[in-house]
């Protein structure tokens, strides 16, 4: 079932800290300011967890292998992550959000949705609230934040990218559908490279192209996601802002443009997936014991393999090694692999972990 109309009464803000981890490092170490900085490990198997804007100018980004990052930017400075510090700053930012609303949905340490429709300060204009929040974040933490304001989460998220860094933008109910129609589908939040490529093969390049398709057509080609694309192409997203809920698992997966047939290629794909899962778990202070590998073959058959450890996984290398050990017995592959996924679950409470388990080595 789809929605007939987008509610225009809600006021949603998406706040996104600018190059958060790297900016914290530049804030705390003046020698790093104005220089290309990558948070992560510089070792051969290291992965970039975050990059400063100076580094991004060279094509350095999160989840990029450190060797590749250094090749793109020879002057790149690697800094080991300090997740305890990032979490402490995130708490400060969350307290600023709470001055205005209790409807806070964190997506990670550095971004969150806020529903300020009925806010604590009684401020009727959401753009004013966003301006106040960004100024308070700068005052309290010394860091810059960008914000997007709209009537739904999807458009607030898209708006927060429009004037980065250190800016904000609004997409009104009047302009929402037109904004989506003009937007390239490959820029839609939630549409990955493989889905964008599929849409383009079907002649869907923009939101307007997507809107021209019927619900039945979209469901035929995109399954359960068809209804989502149908609504989003019309600027409709009625998802509520939901405060934090306990996570049962954290996973990452990737669909490949060309099916994978050999083990080395599959191993290379596991590395960034494990890094993405680890980065999110470290940011949330989650410590898990069960690693699950998901494999989707070219004929869409899906298999999973899991392994549970006696103690919580303490390092990124251990997570990746566990995933790789689950992968290797599947080769030689009986058919091409279309998708790989890595998930960490069986989380334990923070108080059960030791201090050294909060340190990340990449």
Segments predicted by a language model, with ranges:
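Gly/Gly-Pro- and Ser/Thr-rich, intrinsically disordered tail segments characteristic of DNA damage-repair
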Residues: 1-221, 226-227, 344, 348-352, ...
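DNA-contacting surface of Y-family translesion DNA polymerases
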Residues: 5-7, 14, 187, 195-339, ...
């Amino acid at each position: 079932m789809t929605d007939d109309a987008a509610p225009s009464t809600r006021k949603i803000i998406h706040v996104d800290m600018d190059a958060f981890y790297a900016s914290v490092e530049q804030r705390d170490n003046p020698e790093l300011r104005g220089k290309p900085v990558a948070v992560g490990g510089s070792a051969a198997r290291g992965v970039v967890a975050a990059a400063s804007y100076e580094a991004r100018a060279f094509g350095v980004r999160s989840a990029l292998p450190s060797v590749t990052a250094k090749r793109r930017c020879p002057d790149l400075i690697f800094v080991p992550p300090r997740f305890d510090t990032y979490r402490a700053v995130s708490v400060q930012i969350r307290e600023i959000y709470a001055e205005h609303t209790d409807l806070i949905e964190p997506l990670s340490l550095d971004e969150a949705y806020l529903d300020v429709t009925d806010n604590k300060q009684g401020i009727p204009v959401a753009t004013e609230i966003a301006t106040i929040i960004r100024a308070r974040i700068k005052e309290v933490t010394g860091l810059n934040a960008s914000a997007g304001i709209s009537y739904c989460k999807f458009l607030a998220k898209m708006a927060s990218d429009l004037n980065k860094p250190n800016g904000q933008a609004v997409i009104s109910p009047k302009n929402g559908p037109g904004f989506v129609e003009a937007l390239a589908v490959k820029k839609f939040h939630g549409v990955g490279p493989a889905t964008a490529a599929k849409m383009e093969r079907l002649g869907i390049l923009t939101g307007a192209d997507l809107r021209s398709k019927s619900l039945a057509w979209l469901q035929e080609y995109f399954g359960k996601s068809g209804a989502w694309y149908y609504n989003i192409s019309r600027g409709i997203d009625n998802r509520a802002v939901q405060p934090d809920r306990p996570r049962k698992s954290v996973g990452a997966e990737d669909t490949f443009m060309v099916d994978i047939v050999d083990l080395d290629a599959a191993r290379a794909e596991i590395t960034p997936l494990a890094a993405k899962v680890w980065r999110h778990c470290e940011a949330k202070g989650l410590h898990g014991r069960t690693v699950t590998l998901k494999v989707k073959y070219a004929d869409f058959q899906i298999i999973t393999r899991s392994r549970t450890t006696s103690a919580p996984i303490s390092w990124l290398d251990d997570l990746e090694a566990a995933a790789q050990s689950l992968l290797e017995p599947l080769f030689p592959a009986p058919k091409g692999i279309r998708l790989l996924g890595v998930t960490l679950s069986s989380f334990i409470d923070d108080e059960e972990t030791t201090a050294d388990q909060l340190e990340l080595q990449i």
